Amino acid sequence: MARYVFITGGVVSSLGKGIAAAALGALLQARGYRARIKKLDPYLNVDPGTMSPYQHGEVFVTDDGAETDLDLGHYERFTGRSANQQDNITTGRIYKNIIERERRGDYLGATVQVIPHVTDEIKNFVLNGNDDYDFVLCEIGGTVGDIEAMPFLEAIRQLGNDLPRNNAVYVHLTLMPYIPTAGELKTKPTQHSVKELRGIGIAPDILLVRADRAIPKEERRKLSLFCNVRESAVIQALDVPHIYDVPMAYHKEGLDSEVLAAFGIDPAPKPRMEPWQKVSDRIHSPEGEVTIAIVGKYTGLKDAYKSLIEALSHGGLANHVKVKLDWIESEIFEKEDPTPWLEKVHGILVPGGFGERGSEGKILAAKFARERKVPYFGICFGMQMACIEAARSLAGVEHASSTEFGPTEEPVVGLMTEWLKGNMLEKRRETGDLGGTMRLGAYQADLAKGSKIAEIYGDTQISERHRHRYEVNIDYKERLEDCGLVFAGMSPDGVLPETVEYPDHPWFIGVQYHPELKSRPLDPHPLFASFIEAAVEQSRLV
């Protein structure tokens, strides 16, 4: 039977509960255990699919097509386990399920209430599908004291009683701020956060305390006394230079040992930390540096590109180099010459996005990369803009555009009205709802033998995750290929273009899917490893 670790946060938000859960999952796996991580989000949206990147950051897409919280990306990258729809739930989805059941009469006329109906729905989500795992880690979104989080906290309180004795452990992540005028770290915010948690009925077993400097032993003893936690269970979580240093740092502080001790597991299997030590060594001892320009439209909030940033760093790890990112708002190129911005970079990446704003700047970035022979990686929207650039500049299609931007006489990119999902035909209308109406999740693609991308993958059949409504129009395939832009990857039915490339360019590849979602520090995605390798070669020419 699985054991459960519930991770809550206090004092302030954005302390890194997701990283803490992911790192703990990695540490348990390093000891040979099977770990699963779930995220419980208190917001009322059914999923983050229609939320603004500025509000929520990246939407992480799973193989089964779920649009989820970006923390699931951390879970996958740290543990290597692919997440699915059953690893993320929101208040919105819970209420939607309950209301649908009430309308069907499933509650047999009972008054539907937060307790027990909402809390039971949460508990069912936590407990379902865990037979193959030794540990299930559940991160509760938000901060203790938030009104939105109350049903979730009540549910995990109840689970502490529902589960067999010693099968639930509560980890509370807090902040210990340093007050410069007093010259000391303060314990009071953590004390009050734990008091709030205990008032709900949850007594934390472990305190994971964020701080920007070492916590003195006396302060740890104080937290132990006032928060009713063993002194050894007051774990300092100090700031580290890189997130992939976190597993080693938490292991050094004894987090995984303390969790296992709380479950009464003694002796515990010894961890195999060599892979994480290797990652840390490569991060801090690079053999060179490359600069990659990210030409995007959400550059003001880096969380909108979280998986992309991580995948580029994985490509750096594979090539023993540091990857420096140069963030460029694509709208700038609509007013200024791109040359001064791009002539010194070693690679250009145009990521996914939605809408017309900044699109012309991305087209100009693709043109610069093509003409100057700079490595170019176009992802989703970035591939579409590269195709529009080729149509305009090489194929003479002067008014080439996308129907996403409005009616056009030359729809090089258009709305997908139908596609195969398994054995079912999915259909969409231009005026349909936005939520859940994209081509989502893992789809297969066939790569042309002898193509550059097939060589990179080492295979001609791949499966990658998608998130898009618009697609390059197959009707323009012949004209674009006549100009040198090869459609090297297609959907198995030969209808949807999946990848494009210029064979005579050092490295110019566009993909309709999102390879960044499957990259891991211990297993970098081949496209990112190859892109950074090409950037290393370019760095010798600049």
From Swiss-Prot:
InterPro entries linked: Class_I_gatase-like, CTP_synthase, CTP_synthase_N, GATASE, GATase1_CTP_Synthase, P-loop_NTPase
Domain Glutamine amidotransferase type-1: 291-541
Active site (catalytic residues): C380, H514, E516
Signal peptide (from-to): none
Record region (Amidoligase domain): 1-265
Amino acids binding UTP: S13, K186, T187, K188, P189, T190, Q191, K222
Residues binding CTP, per UniProt: S13, D146, I147, E148, K186, T187, K188, P189, T190, Q191, K222
Entry's family note: Belongs to the CTP synthase family.
Protein name: CTP synthase
UniProt source species: Mesorhizobium japonicum (strain LMG 29417 / CECT 9101 / MAFF 303099)
Upper taxonomic lineage: Bacteria, Pseudomonadati, Pseudomonadota, Alphaproteobacteria, Hyphomicrobiales
UniProt gene name: pyrG
